[in-house]
Every structure is written in C-alpha cells, then in structure tokens.
Amino acid sequence: MMVKKILITGASGFIGGILVEHLSKNSNYDVYGIDKHIGLSSRYQLENTSTSEGQQPILPPKEKFYVCDITDRNQLLHIIQDNQINIIIHLAAVLDAETVEKINYINCDGTKILFDIATQQDHVEMIIYASSGLTVAGYFENEPYSSLIKNIIQKEPFKKLTINDPPIPSHVNPSREAYCNSKIYGEQLARQYSSSDGINVKFVCARFGWINTADTITMDSFNSDWCSHRDLCQFIDRVLENQLKLKRFQIYFVTSNTDFCWLDTGNCREDLNYVPQDGARWNQLLTKM
C-alpha cells in the first residue's frame, strides 16, 4: 500500500493534536500540519480543563509542520504542491467567540482558498472537511428539540435529525449564527466543487458532535451529541480505509452512542461501518451523581 501524505490544517488546535498523534502511529500515513499559531488550544481554558505546566500541543515533526495562515494562498499552494499532499483534513477555523468578520474571513474565505488550491492538484484525492452538528442548531428553537436544552426528557421517541434535514443555524447571537453559517457554507462549497467537471477530489463533510477537552460526558441532554476522542479517531480511520468506495460528496453526523442523541448517524454506519465505541446511558449518568 502506498503511503498517503495527509495534511491537517489547524494542526496546533485541540482536535488537530488528537488526530496528529493518532495518525502518526500508522505507518500507512505521512502526517503534515499547518497552523497560524503554535501553542496549546484555548479550548482547555474555555472548558476549565486542567493542563500540566508547560504543556505543548502535539505536532508533526518540525520539517513537516508549517506556520501558515489558511488565507495565505501562495504559501498554502507551495506546501500542498511541494509535499505532494494526497489527503487534507481541514480543521482550521475560529470559534463563535470571535467577531462575525473574523469568522467569515477565516472559516469562509480561508476554506474557499484551500478548496480552490486543492482541487487543482492531481495528487490531492480527498478532503475531509470538519463541519459541525451546529449546522442544525436552529432546530433547538422549536419542540421537541428545545426541551433538550432544558434537560426535559421526552417520554416519546423524537425524530432524529438526518443529513436530509435542511441546515438551520442557531440565532442565539450574531457570532454563533455566523459560525453555523460558515460551516453550512463550507458544505455547500464542497458540494459545488464535487459536482464540477474535471475535479476528481472527493469531499467528506463531517458534522462532528460535541468533542470536549476532558473527553467526558456530563448529565446534560443538550450535550447528548457528545463524540469521544476515540470515536473521532475511529471515524477518520473508517473514512481513510473506505476512500475508494466513497461517493464524490458525502455528509455524516459523527457522535458517540449516547441516550437522547438528536443526530442520526445511520449513513455513517452503513457507508463506513462506523460503530461508536463510547457513549453513556442516562441512568448511568444519574448513578454517578
């Protein structure tokens, strides 16, 4: 099997570090990374997760890591071409704590620049785009999903959202709405490129659930879309293993197996044989209290 060269954007980030560490253990992959900054993700502080003194992000070897802004077209082009990258895992993005302008610039403009460059290279085979379960966060503004925010457990089963349900962004605040819309835009862009003549790059849009720094789930039904670090890595493994079988464009919800999860991962199981290894039952969470 030919060694695949994988480029991870946002490699210095929280999820980037998980995937760099995981994929680097596989001799079938040669892992590269780019990020605008080098430093421990702000997610640890935002989520009050303790870290050891001087803890640093897990990065590829220095000769395979580049300090690069995702909007720097020229540098990005050289990195992808010079290293003959085969697969791109696009994680680079700013969170909804930023301004609307910055979210649009990095998450939308940066993604378009990356897709533009990647789809013009014969050696690029696939892009795994880190979308988000927040693409459908607007459903929480209506029942039965709004009850989940209040931790009101439904007596009757409710319909899980599938990839066929139209995206609806959250309207909680302008930044959250901009973040949701930026992920919806990225998916639309991927669909557009995948249907264009002369482009052979496959696009997988992964609507990841709630991946937290502590890698634990709390008794909060709003967070029932939790995805463990182990299941995140399993999903990426399954996509890479099934690359040849995949359609040119696909969307997947990616979560662990938790009670009251409102996202349907059925096509993920059918296409990729993805079976979550982690999760929690509601009565187990109650017992721990």
Regions found by a protein language model. Give the residues of each.
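Alpha-helical substrate-binding/gating segment
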Residues: 207-214, 226-248, 257
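Conserved Rossmann-fold NAD(P)-dependent oxidoreductase catalytic core, especially the SDR/UDP-sugar
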Residues: 113-173
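Rossmann-fold cofactor-recognition segment
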Residues: 56-72
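NAD(P)H-binding glycine-rich loop region in Rossmannoid oxidoreductase-like domains
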Residues: 67-106
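N-terminal Rossmann NAD(P)H-binding glycine-rich loop of SDR-like oxidoreductase domains
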Residues: 6-26
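Active-site Tyr-X1-5-Lys
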Residues: 151-202
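Conserved C-terminal active-site "lid" loop/helix of NAD(P)H-dependent oxidoreductases
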Residues: 248-275
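Glycine-rich NAD(P)-binding loop of the Rossmann-fold in SDR/ketoreductase-type enzymes
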Residues: 71, 102-113, 181-184, 227
